[in-house]
């Protein structure tokens, strides 16, 4: 069974949770006899080692662009990195030429998703769309920002959205996948006759159970003999590292041995510059470590998780929280802002801590319990580790293969 997977971005330099989840999904699909072929935009620097290619997957890259006039180079890079509604002419021809195609699976919305939908209809193959970042289950502030007219240039590509019916992605899809039960419920309410499936992300537990602390210590000697507080994720306003830096002076005053580690690529350069500027202030200087982006399943990342006294997730929006499962698998306590994804995994006070961003005192109380009661923290992490065992990569991929087979059979019966 050959399945074309459409991605709006696949950049090894900006590898984060979504890319990691997709990579693991492909590993599981291959183990279940599914042949995934990846379609994604070409990179400006084409010399980077592609983790999917290194794993033996076929990756077809196409030319893509942001159809907006008047953009600065920095703004254009930012839109390509996160959130930009890309367009491609190459992709149309490439998908037409794809042989033995059984399923079209888009992991992108907007014009890229619309192109995939259009070609799927023309080729009469089932169309599946996965929502990775949330559509309906978003904080009101983020929804409003999406609906605010862009003031960064003239978007001349609107016609392509109409031509490829990008607004009909959900209504015309054969199945909608989301990793979030709340998102699924909202989608089902809006599309009552549509097949909406909760498809969580999987975790290869053995990777996080293998001791990699020496790899982390060798790469980041600053963490030696420190209470490491790890925030793992791309540097981006949605991930909200700035909020954590606001709390950092209180943390450092109470826990002089603590070291805050921000691990992940920067996908929003203006925000990243704000973070770097803040780190030069006397109250934070030398107390916060920026690692930059690290490759998938890198021993240094695993080692950081294993060395951490706690994983802190201050995100404004988190539709799943893959890093929570990774932390638990590594035996690390979790403290997370109360977004819908983490709230579905973390039972407050049982296997982790949830806090509200507008009540920082609750965060500091949870952090105090984690650092001052290590036996309790270890017990909570152990409970989380048991939950993470339910997210087997192969089992979740087998579930998706079954959905593919059902859609193919239904399409055959309908014709």
Question: Model segments located where?
Answer:
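N-terminal subdomain of nucleotide-sugar transferases
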Residues: 1-60, 395-398, 415
